[in-house]
Regions:
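A short, Lys/Arg-rich alpha-helix, primarily the initiator
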Residues: 1-20
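Conserved hydrophobic/aromatic packing and binding residues within compact polymer-binding modules
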Residues: 14, 28-29, 39-42, 70
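Residues within the helices of the helix-turn-helix
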Residues: 15, 26, 57
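Alpha-helical residues within the helix-turn-helix
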Residues: 19, 30, 61
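Short coil turns linking two alpha-helices in DNA-binding domains
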Residues: 24, 35-37, 52, 66
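Recognition helix of helix-turn-helix/homeodomain-like DNA-binding domains
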Residues: 33-49
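Short, basic-rich loop-to-helix N-cap that marks the start of a DNA-contacting helix
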Residues: 46-61
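Short C-terminal boundary/hinge segments that cap the last helix of small helical domains
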Residues: 64-75
Length: 75
């Protein structure tokens, strides 16, 4: 079982749920207390390291989904 995080898939899911909640990247970034540039990198799967757990927790809370939903690889 591969436990690594697919940053591209994570970013796609965050973007999907953000749009479903009718939020812009700017609004989500502000609510999570991160820069818009970093939010954009997360959604594009361009983060060099994994997204930190506190940031991921904040994103999931704002979007109203579980961290598991964001990280789950739906193969």
């Amino acid at each position: 079982m591969d436990s690594s995080v697919d940053n591209r898939l994570l970013g796609l899911k965050i973007a999907y749920f953000r749009k479903k909640n009718r939020l812009t990247q700017v609004q989500l970034a502000n609510q999570v207390h991160i820069s818009v540039r970093y939010m954009s990198k997360i959604e594009c799967g361009q983060v060099t390291n994994c997204v930190s757990l506190p940031v991921l927790h904040s994103i999931s809370k704002v979007l109203g989904v579980s961290i598991d939903t964001l990280l789950k690889n739906d193969e």
